Regions:
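Active-site cofactor/cluster-binding pocket
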Residues: 1-233
Length: 237
């Protein structure tokens, strides 16, 4: 929701957003759809089938779903990972690599977890901070958003929206969020799968992954005061 509000303000567009939850209560995969348009958006709560940008905060998402499904040719895929671009590419299923190459997808990785952990004053705010790091990744590296604008111009627009959202909480809160956005931009790396190193990875036998949704569910605690405190488990990310 925060990403929707910030991007709509930066781009000066109309917006709609809607979550889609699984039937399970804890640890279930969740999709969140965002639509931005210069014209009023008539549809509501729509499950989008064709999209231009996909953000996956779960680096194991390929184990239990296909985050590339519906991503348009030339679109952008942003994946949470603490690994190097080469390591990330090596862990992808062969079919995912094939899809990314054929559709010429702009593939980016960011360790939003590390950025969030560094700045979050409490575990309860860590999830929000992780989302703000992704805002930096989108604003700084997605062509539909940056539209060739300079980093300075983008950050100035972002600051206005952050001040609008959090200004009542004080200048320190605004600056703290801006620092996360700046680091989110800097922590985002392009996966240059056209390079020779990635071609060599493709030639190696693919690793066999165990398809078990519990791998993603394991990042949420089943007890305790914070239902998603386990999300910030370095062993998971």
């Amino acid at each position: 929701k925060l990403l929707t509000d910030i991007l709509a303000g930066v781009l000066e567009m109309h917006s709609k957003s809607a979550p889609k939850y699984g039937s399970e209560k804890s640890g279930a995969p969740t999709n969140f759809y965002i639509t931005l348009s210069p014209d009023p958006i008539k549809i509501t709560n729509a499950e989008l089938e064709d999209v231009e940008v996909v953000i996956s905060p779960d680096h194991r998402s390929f184990i239990h779903t296909n985050p590339l499904r519906g991503l348009a040719a030339g679109g952008t895929f942003i994946l949470q990972s603490s690994a190097t671009p080469e390591e990330v590419w090596a862990e992808l299923p062969p079919q995912a690599r094939k899809t990314i190459r054929e559709k010429k997808i702009n593939f980016l990785v960011i360790d939003a977890f590390a950025v969030a952990k560094k700045h979050a004053p409490t575990p309860e705010l860590a999830t929000r901070m992780m989302g703000i790091a992704f805002i930096g990744a989108v604003a700084g590296h997605v062509q539909q958003v940056s539209a060739g604008a300079s980093a300075k111009a983008i950050l100035e627009k972002m600051r206005k929206q952050i001040a609008k959202k959090f200004g009542s909480k004080g200048a320190a809160v605004v600056e703290g969020n801006m620092e996360v956005i700046r680091e989110g931009i800097e922590a985002t790396h392009k996966v240059d799968y056209t390079a020779a190193a990635f071609t060599k990875i493709d030639a190696k036998p693919a690793a066999i992954a165990l398809r078990n949704v519990s791998l993603s569910a394991s990042m949420c605690q089943t007890s305790g005061s914070s239902g998603c405190g386990g999300m910030f488990d370095r062993e998971y990310f």
